[in-house]
Design a protein with these regions (language model features):
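C-terminal "cap" of GNAT-fold acetyltransferases
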Residues: 124-126, 131-134, 149-177
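Conserved acetyl-CoA-binding loop of GNAT-fold acetyltransferases
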Residues: 141-150
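Conserved GNAT acetyl-CoA-binding A-motif
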Residues: 109, 116-131
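Conserved acetyl-CoA-binding loop-helix of GNAT-fold acetyltransferases
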Residues: 101-115
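Short amphipathic alpha-helix that is part of the acyltransferase structural core
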Residues: 1-41
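Conserved beta-hairpin
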Residues: 44-64
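Conserved acyl-donor/pantetheine-binding loop and adjacent beta-alpha core of acyl/acetyltransferases
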Residues: 59-92, 100, 154-157
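Conserved active-site tyrosine of GNAT-family acetyltransferases
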Residues: 130, 140-141
């Protein structure tokens, strides 16, 4: 398949989100119903879309967050202060099912890494945190994310997501390549 002509941009209120279908009901519902509300009304996250032509083929929602130094992987704790540290949190990420398997998930993550570097230079950021669903853990692990310690809890019949972390230093090294 030829290389897709893709672009990234922030979600706009007028964007038609109804035709996007990742095959995951929860992600599709979030994108179609809540991404705009969270961005334009509540201001708790920003959704960026991946477009080919006028078609939305993927999205990522990010927000600012914090992490305690003791929750970081041991190799990321060196010389950090003992108070909550700023991170960029990936809240949701999905690719339209017609475009899955083409490497667009990696491209949208690389875009998010640029956002994390921008956050670092403007406000501070020690890394990126994601709560990976069971089926996505290997995807994030291959990209260098490390598992975080988790609290044991109950979510009913839903599997518990795995918190994972990628340090800003690792992101800087990857972007330079």
């Amino acid at each position: 398949m030829p290389e897709l002509d893709i672009q990234f941009r922030a979600l706009k209120a007028k964007d038609d989100k109804t035709v996007f279908c990742s095959g995951n009901i929860e992600l599709d519902r979030f994108f179609q119903r809540y991404a705009g509300q969270n961005q334009f009304r509540h201001h708790i996250g920003t959704t960026y879309i991946l477009l080919t032509g006028n078609k939305i083929v993927g999205f990522i929602t990010v927000s600012a967050g914090e992490i305690a130094v003791d929750d970081l992987p041991s190799q990321s704790r060196s010389r950090l202060p003992e108070y909550p540290l700023p991170v960029m949190r990936i809240a949701r990420l999905a690719i339209d099912k017609q475009f899955q398997g083409l490497g667009l998930g990696k491209k949208i993550l690389r875009f998010s890494f640029e956002l994390a570097l921008d956050m670092k230079s403007h406000y501070g950021c020690v890394g990126v945190v994601v709560d990976a669903k069971q089926e996505s853990i290997n995807f994030y692990h291959k990209l260098g994310f490390l598992p975080l310690e988790t609290l044991v809890g109950e979510l009913g019949d839903r599997p518990q997501p795995k918190p994972m972390f990628l340090s800003i230093k690792t992101i800087e090294q990857a972007i330079k390549k």
